[in-house]
């Protein structure tokens, strides 16, 4: 009996000594595993973020059909950027893409950008001739995105220099044509009379939709136009070739084209922040800064929220994806499993210079991740 008590005491002593040591080791091991898991998750998200930024660069150039980023300096942009109402309204009222998570729909849109507004600056043409010793203005080349049956608006914008006294100005827009037998080289497009008050100059818009549509249907008829804005003394107030201090006052065309919406369907996903410990597939914030890229050719936005997807897609959570689950059950070794990918993406509006120094305001599809899921 005494020996039995001794064995019991020894056994209890071993439990007391050994027990806490084992528990501490297990706790430390568990903590180390958790820390290692968090570090791996952070590194994985950082790599995913970097890959997403590089992919965005490639996508933007591809969707705008640009082989390389346009090489336009800040000084050139300052000279080319019109100081005109339509462009200022676009910049002032520009709606940088909001992170709107209230709608759970998945956007189905085209891969290439759908243009809404194109601002075309005048360019030189070998066809233009001098009339009465004055260089002609202006000739416009049009993007292939502009099709005559999709044009909803076309405005010619011209700037009139300021006057010192109240003046009546006669504005005339002439279309250059092939010389006729009687020597006529142009035909009238629009004429209007304006009353100008002393002070600053003014921008005047003129509807040229019909002329533009004719040019698009018959490109060979596009020989250019001549702009005149004569005051009562015969002085031309129209800025056609800007002089000193007249940067941004060139004439230009503002063209609006149609856009066709697409259908959508429902979907849902998780939202996380950079400090989240969530291991499942989740959407994380990511801001794209075009100035950091050195992309001065993008006028607006200078930055936008793009977001990215990261996380695990465990088969145990796949009641929502029965097809993927059945494939895995049928061939567990041959299936790579679902990936955490965007399930809802939305477009951004962008104002930019293209490779031909034209200013384009367009919608670029699938540039913002709104939802993430396993698929």
From Swiss-Prot:
Modification comment: Synthesized as large precursor molecule that undergoes proteolytic cleavage to generate an N-terminal propeptide and a disulfide linked C-terminal dimer, which is the biologically active molecule. The circulating form consists of a latent complex of the C-terminal dimer and other proteins, including its propeptide, which maintain the C-terminal dimer in a latent, inactive state. Ligand activation requires additional cleavage of the prodomain by a tolloid-like metalloproteinase.
Chief location of this protein within or outside the cell: secreted
CDD domains in alphabetical order: TGF_beta_GDF8
Keywords of this entry: Cleavage on pair of basic residues, Cytokine, Disulfide bond, Glycoprotein, Growth factor, Heparin-binding, Secreted, Signal
SMART domains noted in UniProt: TGFB (SM00204)
One family name in Pfam for this protein: TGFb_propeptide
Superkingdom, natural source: Eukaryota
Propeptide positions: 24-266
Site description Cleavage, residues in chain: 98-99
GO molecular function: cytokine activity; growth factor activity; heparin binding; identical protein binding; protein homodimerization activity; protein serine/threonine kinase activator activity
Biological-process GO terms, alphabetical: cellular response to dexamethasone stimulus; muscle cell cellular homeostasis; myoblast migration involved in skeletal muscle regeneration; negative regulation of insulin receptor signaling pathway; negative regulation of myoblast differentiation; negative regulation of myoblast proliferation; negative regulation of phosphatidylinositol 3-kinase/protein kinase B signal transduction; negative regulation of satellite cell differentiation
InterPro entries associated with the record: Cystine-knot_cytokine, TGF-b_C, TGF-b_propeptide, TGF-beta-rel, TGFb_CS
Location relative to the cell: Secreted
Known function: Acts specifically as a negative regulator of skeletal muscle growth.
Family: Belongs to the TGF-beta family.
Assembly mode: Homodimer; disulfide-linked. Interacts with WFIKKN2, leading to inhibit its activity. Interacts with FSTL3.
PANTHER family for this protein: GROWTH_DIFFERENTIATION FACTOR 8, TGF-BETA FAMILY
The name this protein goes by in its record: Growth/differentiation factor 8
Organism of provenance: Sus scrofa (Pig)
Name of the gene: MSTN
């Amino acid at each position: 009996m005494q020996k039995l008590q001794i064995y019991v005491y020894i056994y209890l002593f071993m439990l007391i000594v050994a027990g806490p040591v084992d528990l501490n080791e297990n706790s430390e091991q568990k903590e180390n595993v958790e820390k290692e898991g968090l570090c791996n998750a952070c590194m994985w998200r950082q790599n995913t973020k970097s890959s997403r930024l590089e992919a965005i660069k490639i996508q933007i150039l591809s969707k705008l059909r640009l082989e390389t980023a346009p090489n336009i300096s800040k000084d050139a942009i300052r000279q080319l950027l019109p100081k005109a109402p339509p462009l200022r309204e676009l910049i002032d009222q520009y709606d940088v893409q909001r992170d709107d998570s209230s709608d759970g729909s998945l956007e189905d849109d085209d891969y290439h950008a759908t243009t809404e507004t194109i601002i075309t600056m005048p360019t030189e043409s070998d066809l233009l001739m001098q009339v009465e010793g004055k260089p002609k203005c202006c000739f416009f080349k049009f993007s292939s995105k502009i099709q005559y049956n999709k044009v909803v608006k076309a405005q010619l914008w011209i700037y009139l220099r300021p006057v010192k006294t109240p003046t009546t100005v006669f504005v005339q827009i002439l279309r250059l044509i092939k010389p006729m037998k009687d020597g006529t080289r142009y035909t009238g497009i629009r004429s209007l009379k304006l009353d100008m008050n002393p002070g600053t100059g003014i921008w005047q818009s003129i509807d040229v939709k019909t002329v533009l549509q004719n040019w698009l249907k018959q490109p060979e008829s596009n020989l250019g136009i001549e702009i005149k804005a004569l005051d009562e003394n015969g002085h031309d107030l129209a800025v056609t070739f800007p002089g000193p201090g007249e940067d941004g006052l060139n004439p230009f065309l503002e063209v609006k084209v149609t856009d066709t919406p697409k259908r959508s369907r429902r979907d849902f996903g998780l939202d996380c922040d950079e400090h989240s410990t969530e291991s499942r597939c989740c959407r994380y914030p990511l801001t794209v800064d075009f100035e950091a890229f050195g992309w001065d050719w993008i006028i607006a936005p200078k930055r936008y929220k793009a977001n990215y997807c990261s996380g695990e897609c465990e088969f145990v959570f796949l009641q929502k994806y029965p097809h993927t689950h059945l494939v895995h059950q049928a061939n567990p070794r041959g299936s790579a499993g679902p990936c955490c990918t965007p399930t809802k993406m939305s477009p951004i509006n962008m104002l930019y210079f293209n490779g031909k120094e034209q200013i384009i305001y367009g919608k670029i599809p699938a540039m913002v991740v709104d939802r993430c899921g396993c698929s």
